[in-house]
Each structure stands twice: as C-alpha cells, then as structure tokens.
Amino acid sequence: MALNACTKLPVARLIRPSASYHPAISSIRYYSAPPESTIPAAKLKYIPTSGTYPKGFLVSGTHVGVKPTNKSTPDLAFLASETPCAAAAVFTKNKFQAAPVTVSRKMLQRRSNTGIRSVIINSGCANAVTGKGGMEDAEKMGAEADRCFDTPSDGKGGSSIVMSTGVIGQRLPIQKILLKIPTAFDGLGSSHEHWLATATAICTTDTFPKLLSRTFSLPSSPEVEYRMAGMTKGAGMIHPNMATLLGMIATDAPIAPTLLPSLLTKAVNKSFNSISIDGDTSTNDTVAVLANGAAGGKEVTSESSEDHAAFQKVLTEFATDLAKLVVRDGEGATKFVTIRVTEAPSEIGARKIASTIARSPLVKTALYGKDANWGRILCATGYSQISEPGQPINEVPEIIPEKTSVSFIPSDGSPELKLLVNGEPESVDEARAAEILEHEDLEILIKLGGGKEEAVYWTCDFSHEYVTINGDYRT
C-alpha cells in the first residue's frame, strides 16, 4: 500500500463503520506479562459496556505490532473530527521531552489552537531521546494522518496531534506505522466498540482500557445535550507535572480556541497533576482536549460567562474521574488511596504535603502490608516542605507539630480512626486499623490546624508486583 493511499478519501468516508477494529478483550499488560494475560476480574467493573459519544468525532484502534511481541492487540489509535476543531494540550515538564511532545506543542502554537483534524497515537515505543531521527518520525506520523483528509491546505502546516508511549530511547518502526495509518483511517467509526478499541490501543502496562463518556448542558443552551468522551493510559512512571501518561478528551460543545488552553490547564491541575503512582515524571506526558461544536448551541467565548464556569466544572470533574482510573490501575496496586490535607495556611503547602505522602515508598509499602504505621505518614509530612539539605526549619510555616492530626477515613462510611490528635498519639485499635486497611479504598486525612486551605492527591500502594513489572518491562 502506498503511503499516500488515503490522500483523496472524502470526508463522508469517515462515517462508514468498519469491521477492522479490535475490541479490548485480553492481553493487557502486554509488555510485562504473558500475552495470554486477561483483564483482572476486579478491574472489569471500570470498563464501560456502553457510552454516549460526542458528535462529529470518529475513532479507531489498529494493530501495527510496534513491539515485536505484540501479535494482535491494537497499538495505533486514531481520533478524527469530521470538521476542523479547536484543541489544546498540556505537556510534561521533564527536560528530556519526547519528539511527539515537541512536534505537537509547536503545531498547536503555530495554528493558535485552531483547525485541528486528528490525534494519532502509538503505544509500544515512546520515541523519546531519539535525536533528529525521532523528531522526523513524529513529524511523519502527523503528516501521514493529515494526508487522510480530503481538504486543501490552509497554509498553516500540519493539523494532527501526535503522541507516543512505551520504552524510552528506542526508534519507532516508522515504516510499519506509516503503512497502517491509512488502515486506521479507513477503520474509523463512532460505536462504543470503536471507542473501546481506541482506548485499548494506547495501553502499555495497563491492565484495562480507561474510557469514560457523559452528557451535560450549558446555561445558555439548556435544550442542547452536549457530550464528552475521553480516554487515558498509564500505570507506571506516574507523577505528572503539567505518567507514562496520555489523555485525550473530545467534546461536541462549541468552545472558543482562545479559552481551551486555560480551561484545560485548570482542569489538569486538579486532576492529572494530583495523582502519583511511583513519583516518576514521564518524558511523554500529554493531555489534550478537542472541541468541534458539532452539537450546536451558542459558542462559549467569554471567561466571565456562566457557560465558561459550567464547562470548567464539567471538564475538571471529567478529567478527575479519568485520572482516578490511572491510579486504580497502578502497576501492582491493590489499594486506591486519597490523601487529603486540610487546615493548611496555603494551598501550595497543602499540595506539597499531599504529594510527598503520595509518593513515599515507606507509606505505600505500609499500606500494602496493611500496617497502620502512621509514623511514616508523619515523617513524610515533616520533610515535605524541605527542598534542599540545610534549609532552616523556621522557613517551614506550614507545619506545627502540636497542631497536626492524622486519621484513617474508612470507605464504608464508618467512623474515622484517629491516629494522631494535635501532635499526641492515640491508642490505636490495631484490629480496627487492619479491618480498614483490608478495603480497596482508603482516605488518609491530615489536619494541620493552621489555616483554611486544603489539597487532595490520589495514589496507590506498592506491592511485590510493581518490582516484577518494572524489572521485566523491556523483556
């Protein structure tokens, strides 16, 4: 097949469903577990059996075989808008940024977040730290996706966001990918199965595809039903600073391109930037949102409007739910843990404390062992504000030991278990503590007693499997 085989496909071709998609059924953790591995029974409840997807967006998941060991599972995701749309993205702050991060950022800047047609994603290879050749590969992926649309050039260059995820330091099998992009385009569709296959295609060590959808309304057009759908991937190397983490959100609401970047940034700060699995920030972190306005209604153009506030709330809540799915699929994780810091002098200080506890190996291993070792929580709280050795302790106003309290909040609605109250240890009922720690969900509450600000982080525990998965990652 020639690389430009889909150059003249009409837009109408986009709406033809194809039988070439691959539903997510098995072989998840493809790169660290045997191919016959199936989705764990405990995770099946997080996979939707149906969805309500935004108008004017079509998706596909196609098998390329980016990793030689992957013989049949989708590893190329394609999302297309039937009309050019507004888009925005936030990217990793890791200094070794992957080629697709650089290419996509420059493309969005060049186009001022307008005229975007698609997102193309491969899993199995991160295309990070791959030099000039890797940059050219990312550009070729975007260009090949662009060629699939029968639209004249607007003179602004490419219009496709490119993402990659997988092993760092290896070049993409670019010819295999380029040959399959027309196939992926030809297989675009709007069914639930198409969306699920696309969510599967971006997975690496994930044990299940992460897909959500919902409907919402805006104050100025209450009669219009808007839709939002999104997918994310990530199970390890998760401590976003904008895990390996990718996220893609699409909506048919009419949002002005000038507003999307700030809307997404605020949503990500309260969601993807508030999760941690292992404390490592990936070279490839990217979360993108696309809005094509296909549902109609009044365009949201003002930051001071009720529509803007309503959409911000919807986007933030949606992104938060997606981010939580990443934590629930933490590599080897057995627990979903909410870290809530309250009564802090500042939100920044509260976030530092929550973040430090969330990535503490000692806290996480204690949770896995069902050990109510609150001393580790207190220890992480105490050093959270210290950025460098030798920093004077009087520069840390956030924490007053004699005002600090720590509790476990059970997920079954039963009373909290107080571990430390105003700096004084409680007589802990170890049997009760063990009972609480048997649950999959747990909240750790830290009250600082010094203010009114708070912050929330979501994390998981560390198990033996985490070491096994990451020790075997490249094999």
Swiss-Prot record:
Post-translation changes: The alpha and beta chains are autoproteolytically processed from a single precursor protein within the mitochondrion.
Pathways per UniProt: Amino-acid biosynthesis; L-arginine biosynthesis; L-ornithine and N-acetyl-L-glutamate from L-glutamate and N(2)-acetyl-L-ornithine (cyclic): step 1/1; Amino-acid biosynthesis; L-arginine biosynthesis; N(2)-acetyl-L-ornithine from L-glutamate: step 1/4
Domain of life assignment: Eukaryota
Site features described as Cleavage, chain residue numbers: 243-244
Positions bearing the site annotation: Involved in the stabilization of negative charge on the oxyanion by the formation of the oxyanion hole: 165-166
Database matches in SUPFAM superfamilies: DmpA/ArgJ-like
Keyword set includes Membrane: no
Active site (record annotation): 244 (nucleophile)
InterPro entries for the chain: Arg_biosynth_ArgJ, ArgJ-like_dom_sf, ArgJ_beta_C
Purpose: Catalyzes two activities which are involved in the cyclic version of arginine biosynthesis: the synthesis of acetylglutamate from glutamate and acetyl-CoA, and of ornithine by transacetylation between acetylornithine and glutamate.
Note: This protein may be expected to contain an N-terminal transit peptide but none has been predicted.
NCBIfam families per UniProt: ArgJ, PRK05388.1
Subunit structure: Heterodimer of an alpha and a beta chain.
Protein name as catalogued: Arginine biosynthesis bifunctional protein ArgJ 1, mitochondrial
Annotated organism of origin: Botryotinia fuckeliana (strain B05.10)
Lineage: Eukaryota, Fungi, Dikarya, Ascomycota, Pezizomycotina
